[in-house]
């Protein structure tokens, strides 16, 4: 049996594991198996909070919504190409294909909207767990340049979008069904994005993996900038804790970094200051527009924002909202130094870190010679970090929130063991 996919639910109280022989669901605190089926080769699994509703990808193009309590199928959907990711909250179901995103009303399973995207083979996409701030984030689609070559009439249509060359994030309101902002997060293409539980913060990382940035949502103010390291690394997973005071990041270095975010009161002050400065810039930008241009943009709305050219006035105005730097120190330094120099002062280092235990090389069904992939989350009840690795291990580490430093391994389990005793406490040994 091999592990195909692993994920936490929206509040990290459950862990879902898709395998070549069915799927398993565990509670995380205490760690215990709560449901198991041994049928089917499950490619992807997603839970809806702590409910019995589970979304499964049974074959590359087929989605099944299942009620585990009643052991019944609610509905099945088939898509034109391979399903790469599934996202859920209490309002929306999001299906990510390589060049499309489908939005459904989760109550009625009615298709609400289809988004055309740039090629997205890694299914970069984040859906807020919040029903109020119900935002979707994904890489900004980049239009293909017009071609002088006219294909024959019988030829299939070519790609309208190309792979992104920069790390811009589009914020889409899934309730209003319109794009509302573009955040210029990185110069390099994105590698990982995640939203917090309230839908008010987004963390981003590029394919270089050295700098992690946090922006406010939906306005796109840059609030924090963290340095993971100086050597490029692939970011596998990022997760806020439930109170949005910590950000946890895992990468191919097999070290997990924890970054501290300001307290809510400090965050509010920083956001207010940024909002004031942004308002001034928007007013200046508006003055430079002709009445015809301004009216046209108001009439078009923002639902077609993703398809606009990069040099559009509205797009430029939206982008500028992401350039504000949070923090009094950065604001003062930025006034005296060029942007490229001042940003060298900004990134904060981690306050705590975790080293993932080395697995036994070449052993187990999920053994491989590549980097150990990991998914991270933080417990909502205790200062603990939960880590699931691609070799099927589940670790729990304790963190000293006051002193920081290296986390301590306290528990270790296997999510692939078939017996009832799925693990042990490190304290027992």
From Swiss-Prot:
Keywords: Autophagy, Endosome, Membrane, Protein transport, Repeat, Transport, Vacuole, WD repeat
Location, primary (coarse class): membrane
Membrane topology, record value: Peripheral membrane protein
Per-repeat ranges for WD: 1-36, 69-114, 139-182, 185-225, 230-269, 309-355, 367-407
GO MF annotation terms: phosphatidylinositol-3,5-bisphosphate binding; phosphatidylinositol-3-phosphate binding; protein-macromolecule adaptor activity
One matching Pfam family: PROPPIN
Keyword Repeat: yes
Source organism, top-level taxon: Eukaryota
Residue numbers spanned by region Disordered: 267-309
Motif window: L/FRRG motif: 226-230
Subcellular localization(s) per the UniProt record: Preautophagosomal structure membrane; Vacuole membrane; Endosome membrane
Quaternary structure annotation from Swiss-Prot or TrEMBL: Component of the PI(3,5)P2 regulatory complex.
Entry comment, domain topic: The N-terminus might form a beta-propeller domain involved in specific binding to phosphatidylinositol 3,5-bisphosphate (PIP2), leading to the association of the protein to the membrane.
Function description: The PI(3,5)P2 regulatory complex regulates both the synthesis and turnover of phosphatidylinositol 3,5-bisphosphate (PtdIns(3,5)P2). Necessary for proper vacuole morphology. Plays an important role in osmotically-induced vacuole fragmentation. Required for cytoplasm to vacuole transport (Cvt) vesicle formation, pexophagy and starvation-induced autophagy. Involved in correct ATG9 trafficking to the pre-autophagosomal structure. Might also be involved in premeiotic DNA replication.
Protein family membership: Belongs to the WD repeat PROPPIN family.
Protein name: Autophagy-related protein 18
UniProt source species: Emericella nidulans (strain FGSC A4 / ATCC 38163 / CBS 112.46 / NRRL 194 / M139) (Aspergillus nidulans)
């Amino acid at each position: 049996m091999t592990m195909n996919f692993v994920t936490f639910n929206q509040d990290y109280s459950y862990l879902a594991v898709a395998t070549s022989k069915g799927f398993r669901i565990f509670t995380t605190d205490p760690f215990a198996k709560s449901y198991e089926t041994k049928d089917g080769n499950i490619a992807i699994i997603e839970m809806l909070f702590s409910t019995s509703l589970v979304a499964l990808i049974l074959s590359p193009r087929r989605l099944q919504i299942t009620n585990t309590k009643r052991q019944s199928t609610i509905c099945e959907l088939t898509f034109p190409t391979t399903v790469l990711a599934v996202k859920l909250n209490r309002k929306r179901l999001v299906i990510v294909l390589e060049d499309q995103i489908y939005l459904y009303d989760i109550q009625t399973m009615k298709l609400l909207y289809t988004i055309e995207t740039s090629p997205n083979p890694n299914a970069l996409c984040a859906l807020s767990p919040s029903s109020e701030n119900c935002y979707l984030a994904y890489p900004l689609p980049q239009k293909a340049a017009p071609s002088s070559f006219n294909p024959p009439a019988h030829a299939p249509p070519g790609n309208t979008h190309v792979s992104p060359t920069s790390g811009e994030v589009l914020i889409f309101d899934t309730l209003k069904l319109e794009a509302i902002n573009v955040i210029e997060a990185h110069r390099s293409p994105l590698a990982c994005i995640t939203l917090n539980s309230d839908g008010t913060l987004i963390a981003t990382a590029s394919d270089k993996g050295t700098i992690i940035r946090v922006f406010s949502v939906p306005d796109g103010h840059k609030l924090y900038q963290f340095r993971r390291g100086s050597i490029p690394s692939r970011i596998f997973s990022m997760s806020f804790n439930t109170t949005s005071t910590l950000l946890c990041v895992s990468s191919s270095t097999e070290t997990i970094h924890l970054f501290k975010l300001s307290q809510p009161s400090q965050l509010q002050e920083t956001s207010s200051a940024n909002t004031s400065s942004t308002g001034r810039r928007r007013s200046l930008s508006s003055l430079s527009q002709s009445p015809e241009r301004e009216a046209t943009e108001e009439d078009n709305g923002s639902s077609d924002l993703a398809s606009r050219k990069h040099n559009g006035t509205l797009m430029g105005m939206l982008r500028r909202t992401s350039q504000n730097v949070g923090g009094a120190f950065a604001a003062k330094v930025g006034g005296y130094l060029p942007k490229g120099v001042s940003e060298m002062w900004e990134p904060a280092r981690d306050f705590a870190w975790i080293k993932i235990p080395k697995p036994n090389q070449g052993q187990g069904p999920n053994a491989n010679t590549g980097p150990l992939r990991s998914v991270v989350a933080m417990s909502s009840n205790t200062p603990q970090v939960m880590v699931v690795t691609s070799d099927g291990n589940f670790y729990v580490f304790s963190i000293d929130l006051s002193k920081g430093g290296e986390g301590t391994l306290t528990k270790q389990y296997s999510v692939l063991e078939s017996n009832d005793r799925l693990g042990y406490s490190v304290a027992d040994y």
